[in-house]
Swiss-Prot record:
This is Small ribosomal subunit protein bS20. GO terms for cellular component: cytosol; small ribosomal subunit. Keywords: Ribonucleoprotein, Ribosomal protein, RNA-binding, rRNA-binding. Pfam families: Ribosomal_S20p. The keyword RNA-binding applies. One of its GO terms (molecular function) is structural constituent of ribosome. NCBIfam families: S20. The keyword rRNA-binding applies. Binds directly to 16S ribosomal RNA. SUPFAM superfamilies: Ribosomal protein S20. GO terms for biological process: translation. Belongs to the bacterial ribosomal protein bS20 family. The lineage of its organism: Bacteria, Pseudomonadati, Pseudomonadota, Alphaproteobacteria, Hyphomicrobiales.
Amino acid sequence: MANTPSAKKAVRKIERRTEVNRSRRSRVRTYLRKLEDALTAGDATAATAAFQAAEPEIMRAVTKGVLHKNTASRKVSRLAARVKKLSAA
């Protein structure tokens, strides 16, 4: 339990930031889910469109500090490879 006024304020700030980060993370997951659905359905055009929507959202999460840069790069790279493979098939 926070005792000092500054510690109590820090707790309040952390709660607000946690809520914002939770919503950002949820937003990224939603885009990834849509892309995953398009990939499993085998729809190349939908997968490409979903990837083009998801990629900036993932990178935005990096800018906002929700995801680590390398994690996001790895996700984008693997998703791009899957979309490319589906489009080629």
